[in-house]
Amino acid sequence: MTRSQKEEVVQYLTEEFKNAAAIVDCDYKGMSVSELESLRRIAKEKGLKVRVVKNTLAMIALRNNGVEDFQLKDTNVLIWGDDLVELAKTVTDFAKEHKENFQIKQGYFEGEVADASKIEAYSKLPSKEELLGMLLSVWTAPIRNLLYVWNAPKQNFVTVLENIRQQKES
């Protein structure tokens, strides 16, 4: 790789990391190319980005964004994206499927370095869509209850009329 290519990679990663909500560093030692491509495909479907990059170049890009505590050693694949819960879920699920060859090392979430256990904890949180559904349910509950109260007298009246009809028929 020439110096200018390295500078382009650092510039690209610096910009990407600046816009990312979270970054995860994973060890992929022993993974086949098809498994790594599978990770890339899954990540792309979820709006995440995956890149295997030299540690020194990634460290420069991270430091350009003020991330000092992030240490890269051995083989690393970096995964990043805008939705930290989706990122954590994707990486955790992939790590469970490929236990022998893929391990979560660390992450950078909300301005701090996170270990694998913290990333796994994030993966158990509800997704943005699930949270919106819960919020919508909370907002609509009072309206549903009000409609039920308004409809109750009508339903009771119909029930009383039905009972009277049945008594007269008997």
Curated annotation (Swiss-Prot):
CDD domains to which the protein is assigned, alphabetical: Ribosomal_L10 (cd05797)
Protein name: Large ribosomal subunit protein uL10
The UniProt record lists the keyword Ribosomal protein: yes
Keyword terms: Ribonucleoprotein, Ribosomal protein, RNA-binding, rRNA-binding
Gene3D superfamilies (alphabetical): 3.30.70.1730, 6.10.250.290
Domain of life: Bacteria
Keyword Membrane: no
InterPro entries listed in its UniProt record: Ribosomal_uL10, Ribosomal_uL10-like_sf, Ribosomal_uL10_bac, Ribosomal_uL10_bac_type, Ribosomal_uL10_CS_bac
GO terms of molecular function: large ribosomal subunit rRNA binding; structural constituent of ribosome
PANTHER family reported in the protein's UniProt record: 39S RIBOSOMAL PROTEIN L10, MITOCHONDRIAL
GO biological process per UniProt: translation
Pfam family, one: Ribosomal_L10
